[in-house]
């Protein structure tokens, strides 16, 4: 619910043009809300109001002052910071504090979402005992998927038929999953890399308008904040495949049947200090308009 304190409103009109749904207009004594039900709750109006006349029934206390320009890092510094983040697969045998894990969740919570649905939900698995149980279930499922996939690959090969696109991209994975399973039996964790914590983002796709994008943005903010906390992270795409293929694993993680796991990443203190940035391929860019050609 959004309301306007008429005593505070100065009719400056700053809020009217920034309203995404165009439901604000100047009245005689204050700005008026034409159709409250259409409000997106994006907070633009409250964020620009010099008099702080807008009130939200939820989250009103979260509209804090933004940092001044001097507190924002320069483009060069920020770009180098972005490049600093890399996949970490070597972790110290050290528990990540709950306070830091909660900070990562907060970073995800404040990420933008399609139509402001804010549908992201999180599972935090902490400690090797709990992680080992999840890892065992995940590897077992991946191994089963690998065997089924290999049967299909062999069948299509015998018939000399091309694999369907969805399988073709995974045809190299069965031996990878077998190797991961074999190493796990030897006590080597090649799925979670012996990390002390794991975070999974999931959501009800019936609520979210852009679920995959929302989860990706939230996780990006989280892994970047992790860098400032002295933590490293690594995305674990194989786990998502396992969760969505195993009702047992989904239940173990407390993810509702109607929700879909979208992103998973490990978290922990680095065991190795990297001295150089990671290399990337050149960007493929098509310019349209002013800079075309």
What would you call each of these model-derived segments?
Residues 1-293:
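Acidic, surface-exposed loops and disordered segments
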């Amino acid at each position: 619910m959004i309301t306007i304190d008429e005593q505070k409103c100065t009719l400056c009109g700053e809020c009217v043009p920034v309203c995404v749904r165009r439901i604000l207009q100047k009245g005689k004594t204050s700005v008026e809300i034409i159709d409250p039900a259409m409000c997106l709750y994006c907070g633009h109006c409250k964020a620009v109001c010099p008099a702080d006349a807008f009130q939200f029934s939820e989250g009103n206390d979260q509209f804090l002052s933004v940092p001044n320009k001097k507190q924002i890092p320069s483009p060069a510094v920020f770009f180098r910071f972005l490049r600093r983040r890399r996949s970490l697969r070597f972790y110290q045998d050290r528990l990540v504090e709950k306070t830091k894990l909660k900070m990562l969740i907060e970073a995800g919570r404040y990420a933008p979402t399609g139509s402001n649905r804010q549908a992201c939900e999180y599972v935090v698995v902490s400690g090797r005992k709990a992680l080992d149980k999840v890892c065992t279930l995940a590897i077992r499922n991946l191994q089963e998927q690998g065997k089924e996939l290999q049967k299909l690959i062999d069948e299509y090969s015998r018939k000399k038929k091309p694999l369907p696109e969805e399988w073709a991209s995974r045809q190299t994975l069965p031996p990878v999953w077998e190797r991961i399973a074999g190493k796990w039996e030897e006590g080597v964790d090649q799925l979670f890399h012996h990390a002390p914590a794991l975070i999974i983002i999931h959501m009800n796709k019936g609520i979210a308008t852009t679920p995959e994008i929302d989860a990706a943005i939230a996780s990006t903010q989280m892994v970047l904040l992790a860098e400032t906390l002295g933590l490293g992270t690594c995305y674990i795409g194989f786990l998502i495949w396992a969760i969505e293929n195993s009702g047992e694993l989904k239940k173990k993680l407390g993810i509702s049947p109607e929700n879909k796991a979208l992103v998973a990443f490990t978290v922990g203190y680095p065991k190795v200090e990297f001295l150089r940035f990671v290399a990337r391929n050149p960007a493929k860019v098509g310019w349209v308009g002013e800079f075309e050609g």
